[in-house]
Amino acid sequence: IFIDKVLNNEISLFENKEEILIGHEVMYGVQKLFADLVLVTPQKMIAIEIKAYHDNFKRLDNQLQGYRKLFDSVYVLITENHVEKIKSLPYKWFGILEITNDRNITLRRKAKIIQKFSKEDILETMPIRYLCEYFNIKHNKLAEDIRLDLRKKTIKDLKKALNIYMERKMGYKFQNFEHERGNVSHYEDISILSMNQLSVLRQ
């Protein structure tokens, strides 16, 4: 239901109405964590962490700290029972979305735009073959040496490369999803968006 509302512009997480790609279980960063949902436009990437009714918050701090290293903003999508707990957390930079029992979604708090990123995590999200192609580098060094050299690039350049990479990798799966889902998305449709395959993200 969240994906449907985003695609129907019922929930606006972007300043401008742009073409949005959505990925599910997208691997990222040095720790090779998986984002529940990633929303990508040509200018911005948003990570969505989902905490359903029976989920706990044990890993939430680590997940949030991982997201902020390369995503432009981060939201936590929660069920009604988690509202007070999520609002009591000391840091307020991430946004809060609440899905109610009657399947409505409320924007509880707008996420702040993140300004500082980790070059290491950005580079580790992209495979060497893509990095060499994008930056026109000969693939005659060890992967770690290539990434080390690329840390000399500006954050702006690396973020642009990452955005294009995400668009490429998520684009074909999202097209399949749009074709299959009909007017309303079902759980089976969401699995089409899954990027939880090493061969897909690291080729």
Where are these regions (language model features)?
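Active-site metal-binding core of divalent-cation-utilizing nuclease and nuclease-like domains
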Residues: 3-42
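Short, flexible loop segments at the rims of nucleotide/cofactor-binding pockets, characterized by
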Residues: 24-27, 50-56
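Short connector loops at helix/strand junctions that flank enzyme active sites
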Residues: 32-34, 43-45, 69-71, 91
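Short acidic-glycine loop/turn motifs at beta-strand connectors
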Residues: 41-43, 100-103
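A conserved mid-domain beta-alpha-beta active-site/ligand-binding segment of alpha/beta enzyme cores
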Residues: 104-178
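C-terminal non-catalytic accessory extensions
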Residues: 168-203
